[in-house]
Each structure stands twice: as C-alpha cells, then as structure tokens.
Amino acid sequence: MSAKARGYVALMKLRVVELLLITTVPVMMLAERGVPSLRLIAVTLVAGTLAAGSANTINCYVDRDIDQMMGRTKRRPLVRATVTPTEALTFGIVIGIVSTLLFGFLVNWPSALLADGAIAFYVFVYTLGLKRRTPSNIVIGGAAGCFPVLIGWSAVTGTVGWAAVLLFAVVFFWTPPHFWALAMKFRDDYAAAGVPMLPVVASVQVVTRRMLGYAYAMVAASLAVAPVASTGPVYLVAAVAVGAWFLVESHRVARRARHGEDPRPMRLFHMSITYLTLLFVAIAVTALV
C-alpha cells in the first residue's frame, strides 16, 4: 500500500470506527431477535464504516491547524503532508456520499438519513461548533458516536424503537467518562492547542466527580434496557455485573483525585472499552436465547 493510500486509511481513524461498530451488530441481532441476513450485516457495516470514516476525515481536515500542536495527533496525514487538505476534504465527502447510497439502496433510507445525520452532527455541531468553544463539547458532541445504535436498529426494522433509544443513552452517558479519562492523560496537549476540554478548565476533582455522575446514569440506562427490550436474565445479570465493575473503578478514580493522588485515568479509559464490549456481547447473546 502506498504512503498516500495509508494516509487516506489513517484519516478514517478505523480503530475508533471499530469501537462504534461493536454496538451495531448486537443491536441488529436484538432488533431481529436472531441473526439478520449476512448480506444486511455486511452492507450495514461497510456503509457504517464509510460514514464514520467520512466524519473522521472531515474532522481531521478542520482540525489540521491544532493537530500539529498536539503530541497525540502530530503524526496524522495532514500534519505530515502525506495527504493535502483538498484531497482529504474530497475523500471525506466522497466516502460520505457512497455511504449514503449504500444505505439508501441496499439497506433502507431511514438508515441513510441517520448516517447523514451522524456525519452532519459530528462535523457541524461538534467539530465546528462546540469543540473549541465549550467544556461541554464532548458531552453534546459525543451524541454523534451513539448513532450506530440507531442505525443498527433501523437497518433491520426501518424505524427506531425505544430499546434503541435506551441503548443510545447508554453510549451517550458512557462517552464523557471514557473521553475525559483520555483527556486527563493528554491535558497538556489540549491546553497547548486551546481546546477547552473539561480536564483543561476544571480541577481533577471536578472532572472525576462528573465522570462518576455519568457512570451512574450509564448504568441506570443499561438496566432500563432489560424491561423495555424484554432481554431476559442473561443480559440483566451481565449489565449488573459489568455496571458494578465500572462504578467501582469510577469511584476509585474519584477517590484518588479527592485525596490528591494520581487518579490513573487510563486504567478507566481502557476498562470503559471492555465494559461497552461486554455489555453489547450480552445483548447479542440475549438475541440468540
């Protein structure tokens, strides 16, 4: 693969996309109460990857000025000039259009509209509107990362059900503690770039208290899924177990911050990925039993 081709792939941030798509297939299975057709799953995943890649690519285009100031992002293709800004913007728009067409003609148009809404929300509301203006950027803007749940449900049913809305809420409340843990680690990067992430503008005690609050909201939403989606005992036991695990770790981070110790936020960051994966695996299992 040429350097430019690798640059285009890097712009899509496929490692982030993987995390988003972890939620999609289990939700499709829950909506189907079984395994949907492999064709539908494949098209939904490909189109979803292109939609998320489109949003990420355009985000890189907009943020190329601050990416060069941050150690975590200074090796991105636009900073290293592997891909030109015009090429990146064109690529982002084109794969977004391809995503829309795949969803519209091979899945359904409600899913296409949801994918377009996710791209627009991430680019215009988060990247252009909130990211450099308010510490609430990731709280509101993080909603873009919840759309795969709605898209997965819509791909199977053509509508958005209450179970999908509650799972959207789970991911929505999961996002702040997940992302703020990372932002605590790279606080100096965000400060140097002038991005007012909460860990930049608030004390570590304030940040960890808010993370804990969102963790409780996330667990509450995950438990509410059980009666609404009629998931049965397998999901409920899993939601209680992994939810308790997440809350214990969130309390540990808050307690260490309160005592003036290093909260070691990356431990919670990595654990949050495991939490989300296990919760949605439980949803997939529920759909099969």
Swiss-Prot record:
GO terms for cellular component: plasma membrane. It holds the Pfam family UbiA. Gene3D superfamilies: UbiA prenyltransferase. Keywords: Cell membrane, Heme biosynthesis, Membrane, Transferase, Transmembrane, Transmembrane helix. It is an enzyme of class 2 (transferase). It is found in: Cell membrane. InterPro entries: Protohaem_IX_farnesylTrfase (IPR006369), UbiA_prenyltransferase (IPR000537), UbiA_sf (IPR044878). The chain crosses the membrane at residues 9-29, 40-60, 89-109, 110-130, 134-154, 155-175, 190-209, 228-248, 269-289. Its EC number is 2.5.1.141. The keyword tRNA-binding does not apply. The keyword tRNA-binding does not apply. CDD domains: PT_UbiA_Cox10 (cd13957). GO terms for biological process: heme O biosynthetic process. It is a multi-pass membrane protein. GO terms for molecular function: protoheme IX farnesyltransferase activity. Pathway: Porphyrin-containing compound metabolism; heme O biosynthesis; heme O from protoheme: step 1/1. It catalyses: heme b + (2E,6E)-farnesyl diphosphate + H2O = Fe(II)-heme o + diphosphate. NCBIfam families: cyoE_ctaB (TIGR01473), PRK04375.1-2 (NF003349). Belongs to the UbiA prenyltransferase family. Protoheme IX farnesyltransferase subfamily. Converts heme B (protoheme IX) to heme O by substitution of the vinyl group on carbon 2 of heme B porphyrin ring with a hydroxyethyl farnesyl side group. Carbon 2 of the heme B porphyrin ring is defined according to the Fischer nomenclature. This is Protoheme IX farnesyltransferase. It comes from Frankia casuarinae (strain DSM 45818 / CECT 9043 / HFP020203 / CcI3).
